[in-house]
C-alpha cells in the first residue's frame, strides 16, 4: 500500500495541497487541491477569515479521501508572522489580523523604547519589517490590552 504525505502551503493569495509519495525510489508530487486566499477588509482592518481557511484545509483533505490517497502525515506552512490569540478554552480572542494591516505603524518605535533595534536583531536574527510579529503584539498591547489579560 502506498504511503502518502500531505503538504498544505498557505500563501497570502492562494493555498494548495501537495501530495507526495515514493515511486521507483523517487519522490512524486501531485497537486490535489488549490484555493484562492486573501485578507478581508472589515471596518478599516485587514483580517484573515480563519474559519474559511480551516474549511479549505478540510476540503483538500476530503479530496485526498475521494481519490483514495489518504496521507499518513501532513504539514501546514503559512506566511509566518501572523498569529491567533486563544483563551484558556482555545477560543479565538479578538480579530485575526493580517500582516498588511496598518495597526503596526509606529510600533517599531514603541518596541525600541523597551528593546533597542540592534539588541532585538541580536536576539532574533530577523530583519526589521513593520509587520513582524513583535510589532503586531505591541499593537495588541497598546490598542487592545484586554486581550492579553
Task: Describe each region flagged by the PLM.
Residues 1-94, 122:
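N-terminal glycine/serine-rich phosphate-binding loop of ATP-dependent small-molecule kinases
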Residues 59-149:
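Glycine-rich phosphate-binding/catalytic subdomain of phosphoryl-transfer
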Amino acid at each position: 500500500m502506498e504511503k502518502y504525505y500531505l503538504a498544505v502551503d498557505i500563501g497570502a493569495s492562494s493555498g494548495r495541497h501537495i501530495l507526495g509519495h515514493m515511486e521507483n525510489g523517487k519522490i512524486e508530487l501531485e497537486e490535489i487541491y488549490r484555493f484562492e486566499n486573501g485578507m478581508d477588509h472589515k471596518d478599516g482592518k485587514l483580517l484573515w477569515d480563519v474559519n474559511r481557511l480551516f474549511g479549505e484545509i478540510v476540503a483538500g483533505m476530503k479530496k485526498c479521501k475521494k481519490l483514495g490517497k489518504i496521507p499518513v502525515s501532513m504539514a501546514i506552512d503559512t506566511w509566518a508572522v501572523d498569529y491567533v490569540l486563544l483563551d484558556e478554552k482555545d477560543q479565538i480572542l479578538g480579530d485575526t489580523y493580517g500582516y498588511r494591516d496598518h495597526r503596526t505603524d509606529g510600533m517599531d518605535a514603541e518596541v525600541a523604547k523597551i528593546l533597542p533595534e540592534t539588541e532585538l536583531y541580536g536576539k532574533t536574527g530577523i530583519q526589521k519589517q513593520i509587520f513582524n510579529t513583535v510589532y503586531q503584539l505591541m499593537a495588541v498591547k497598546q490598542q487592545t490590552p484586554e486581550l492579553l489579560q
